[in-house]
Amino acid sequence: MTMTLAVYGKGGIGKSTTSCNISVALAKRGKKVLQIGCDPKHDSTFTLTGFLIPTIIDTLQEKDFHYEDIWPEDVIYKGYGGVDCVEAGGPPAGAGCGGYVVGETVKLLKELNAFDEYDVILFDVLGDVVCGGFAAPLNYADYCLIVTDNGFDALFAANRIAASVREKARTHPLRLAGLIGNRTSKRDLIEKYVSHVPMPVLEVLPLIEDIRVSRVKGKTLFEMAEGDSMLDYVCDFYLNIADQVLAAPEGVVPSEASDRELFSLLSDYYLNPPVEKTQEDELDLMMV
């Protein structure tokens, strides 16, 4: 049975880089994986393929929306590690709806019987405040994964996405698998948030420059690690996420905080940060 994942997070947080590396990690675990980019920039799969692949919406327009004239090889491109890649594309700037494009993408892939061929399908989705259109992949997902960092804005976006998961979970068995902290040197604010809005934290990746560089190079960390074994430990973070997802976790239907409540919680943490114990304080406690 196919497992479907939807990856969300604040714009610029590193969703696509994270998604590509998770897709490769899943492939390394022997799964046949399809990654679907849901962003008008159509750059979700760039680090898997090394170039901007044509979008489904462009292909449909070229064929005058005659689905019967489209073959799998017209829209599905092979990426690193054997991961298959699709870019939904999007409507012209300032016009149309991204949700419609996602719907057309799913419709075409079903026409091609593509969904039945994969162990895991991963949607990499644009947007940090999830409108009805870009929440569409949640209609098909078993699990949502939220990429964040240790900052106010990213966690505020995560809370909004959690609200969308709760809403979509009313109509089908969608669960939030958990948060993924990306390129952050601390996790204290993440822990503060999940103590108030309970949800798993799948992994927190440290502030590793190679993660950012991989995006510019158009390569996953796994591909970069082939020439630099020092990066193997970075790949282990993504393999750990893949293992947790493949274990079919129970997940949660989150109960998000209200905007005012969250603003108060996180801003108070900035204004009144906890006092870190010094080494001398810890020694004093040990002597008591």
UniProtKB/Swiss-Prot annotation:
Signal peptide: none annotated. [4Fe-4S] cluster binds at residues 97, 131. It is an enzyme of class 1 (oxidoreductase). Its EC number is 1.3.7.7. PANTHER family: LIGHT-INDEPENDENT PROTOCHLOROPHYLLIDE REDUCTASE IRON-SULFUR ATP-BINDING PROTEIN. One of its GO terms (molecular function) is oxidoreductase activity, acting on the CH-CH group of donors, iron-sulfur protein as acceptor. Belongs to the NifH/BchL/ChlL family. The keyword Transmembrane helix does not apply. The keyword Metal-binding applies. The gene is chlL. Its cofactor is [4Fe-4S] cluster. The lineage of its organism: Bacteria, Bacillati, Cyanobacteriota, Cyanophyceae, Oscillatoriophycideae. CDD domains: Bchl-like (cd02032). Pathway: Porphyrin-containing compound metabolism; chlorophyll biosynthesis (light-independent). NCBIfam families: DPOR_bchL (TIGR01281). Component of the dark-operative protochlorophyllide reductase (DPOR) that uses Mg-ATP and reduced ferredoxin to reduce ring D of protochlorophyllide (Pchlide) to form chlorophyllide a (Chlide). This reaction is light-independent. The L component serves as a unique electron donor to the NB-component of the complex, and binds Mg-ATP. GO terms for biological process: light-independent chlorophyll biosynthetic process; photosynthesis, dark reaction. Transmembrane segments: none annotated. This is Light-independent protochlorophyllide reductase iron-sulfur ATP-binding protein. Mg(2+) binds at residue 16. ATP binds at residues 12-17, 41, 182-183. It catalyses: chlorophyllide a + oxidized 2[4Fe-4S]-[ferredoxin] + 2 ADP + 2 phosphate = protochlorophyllide a + reduced 2[4Fe-4S]-[ferredoxin] + 2 ATP + 2 H2O. Keywords: 4Fe-4S, ATP-binding, Chlorophyll biosynthesis, Iron, Iron-sulfur, Magnesium, Metal-binding, Nucleotide-binding, Oxidoreductase, Photosynthesis. Homodimer. Protochlorophyllide reductase is composed of three subunits; ChlL, ChlN and ChlB.
